[in-house]
Amino acid sequence: MDVITMSIFLFERDNEKSVIDNLRLLIQMSLKSIELLKDYMNSKDEKILKEIIKIEEEGDETTKNIRINLEKAFLPNMRRELSRSAELLDETLDSLKHAAMLYELLKEEFDEYLKNEIDLVLMITVDMFQHLDRVLDVIEKGGDLDPIIKEIKDKEKFIDDVYQNRIYKYLINLEVESFWEGKILCDFIDNIVNISDYIEDVADELHIIYLHTK
């Protein structure tokens, strides 16, 4: 069967479909947390922080449900990749929670340059999550995965370039009040930037499943 028109038909039973649906749910949770984090960076509203923490806790439960359904599913050769995908998506929620909690500790707001760079990273990250959702479409319904994987990898490389060549170089020369203020700032940015690595890793795990079906 032509790869481009290939349909996998492996996720039609309840347990298999539940795994995919819960992976999608983790993606939607991450997208929601990103929007909340952006709002929190503008307001430091404690209610928003609590909502981000609550979403992370719900993500833990969703990840547990995925593991349970994987044990019941009939795809033993794909369990590792799907379980790892769930763990990585759960890590994105952890990173967003930690980023919000670190931002709470910062005494100073970001200057315009740094805020714009972080907004750019978050915008590209949102786009990567949307592409990851398209990967699940192909895994579930069939299609050509390679162009979507390439887009995700290109966007991850772009975020790496922004971090290495713009944010990191800027931070080196940034004056901060204390060592701890600087560490909190760097840890915040690391949590934001690392999300793109998690997304790329999920895409790689799902790509393995796709290749198994060829």
UniProtKB/Swiss-Prot annotation:
Superkingdom of origin: Archaea
Sequence similarity: Belongs to the UPF0111 family.
Protein name in UniProt: UPF0111 protein MJ0629
Source species of the chain: Methanocaldococcus jannaschii (strain ATCC 43067 / DSM 2661 / JAL-1 / JCM 10045 / NBRC 100440) (Methanococcus jannaschii)
